[in-house]
């Protein structure tokens, strides 16, 4: 299976190689796209996005905004207003732990952001992994994707607020469900103790080749799985495990958790 799926990633691998020394140009292109997309929003009109050209003009005319300065605009978006900071209606909001004033922040997650940043970034990570590991059999088994939970946003239709990982799982390509565990219903359980037990039981008898998620959460799930299975080492449960994709924390924390996983 991996040999067949690998071909899907080949063209992107070539693009990534081509772009290795084009960081500045790529970032300028992204900025131009963002300005063009948002020019008819309230924020875009207030800051003359329609006539704005380039990075220098952007930095000269757009102040650095704190979350608190944008909070009123985000609250209006959460209540269903359109064309405020981004065109159309933004339905999803990632809830982050509050680092200022002990209050949570709600980060708008647009459909374009999901497609062009989060999912594309995940695709690119797999593309680079396959390129660097020609003997990989990662698609010959299952992917354990660990996420948080979400809840209705002000009871607005189809609008959700919660962990970014839960929003990603909720909107994932249905084809990914063919190789992903746990079931969506399990993945989105809000009580983590119940969730980690169910995931551990669901995953321990599957041929898992790769895992994804916040390292501290993943370690908790793996610890529970080892308790239930009675095994000493992770490879005894998943002999074909080869990759841990992670984010959400500082890289050195991820590496520390990876080492703990290896030791189990």
Language-model segments: residues:
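Nucleotide 5′-phosphate-binding alpha/beta core
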Residues: 1-95, 101-245, 253-254
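Terminal presequence/propeptide segments associated with secretion/organelle targeting
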Residues: 23, 263-264
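Conserved small/polar residues in nucleotide/adenosyl-binding loops
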Residues: 96, 256-263
